[in-house]
Swiss-Prot record:
Substrate binds at T12, A13, S14, G15, K16, S17. Keywords: ATP-binding, Magnesium, Nucleotide-binding, Transferase, tRNA processing. Belongs to the IPP transferase family. NCBIfam families: miaA. ATP binds at G10, P11, T12, A13, S14, G15, K16, S17. Its EC number is 2.5.1.75. The record marks T101, R124 as: Interaction with substrate tRNA. Pfam families: IPPT. This is tRNA dimethylallyltransferase. The gene is miaA. It catalyses: adenosine(37) in tRNA + dimethylallyl diphosphate = N(6)-dimethylallyladenosine(37) in tRNA + diphosphate. Residues 35-38 are annotated as: Interaction with substrate tRNA. Its cofactor is Mg(2+).
Amino acid sequence: MAIQIVLIVGPTASGKSKLAVDVAKEFNGEIISADSMQVYKYMDVGTAKITKEEMQGIPHYLIDIVEPDQEFSVAEYEKRAKEIIKDIYKRGKLPIIVGGTGLYINSIIYIMHFSDFEGSKEFREKMKELANTYGSQYLYEKLKSVDPEAAKKIHPNDIRRIIRALEVYEFTGKPISYYQKMSGMRLNPEYQPIMIGLNFRDRQILYDRINQRVDEMIKNNLVEEVVNLLKIGYNKDSTAMQALGYKEIVEYLKGEISLEEAIEKIKKGTRRYAKRQITWFKGYDFIKWFFVDDYKNYEELKKNIIKYLAGKLNF
């Protein structure tokens, strides 16, 4: 029998983490993160990582599992997440996957054709050298020429994902977008996914929440977090330091831009990222959208989502 899994997706700053905890409390669940930046240790503020207090005793998995200079592939995520789902299910609990990284979500619910693809560390190092010499835009243009479809979904500064897409093309002869489409045709029969999407009818409300979150990150010592990462020995080329919110602070610390400019760049980049996330999740035809601004308050939103899930789950 297929394992029922609840997936809570949506753009950054939409309230997914809080909702996941409430759903877990209601249905005896445990939570698996699907966030490609929260896998990294020592990066709490800039990734808006859930705190121990906010977890309210609910077990959370795939958070704080790798060093900031380590690579963590979709294949590795898929392997670990599926093992954890099985374990949660065996213990009679509900697996809840929460996050905004579309490829991580896909690796669970679809049969991914490129998930076993390991690639080449040598190739990745070579690409990083090119990026250091000519800038990330150089690699982005390269990707646009071989896989324009994938390039549309990847930010020009997201070196990690640009290199991954180039690597898949280099070693399989087919663009990564081809495999993503292929995977979309076949849902994984091991699971019965029940997907909740959080969104806003008024996009400006989401953008205001993003701006507020970035301001809070600065108040909560994001700059100090980046300084500490650099002190430990991680540099601007470390895998995780390429992330939105970190690379801009590194630019500020190097005197290339002011703090105000760094904050504005983070806000703008995050708003763009949220827009791309919404586009991605709209591609799931089985998603049930809940618009946060349709409800008087969070309690009313939560009540409606729990009612919807109660009608779907065998729990």
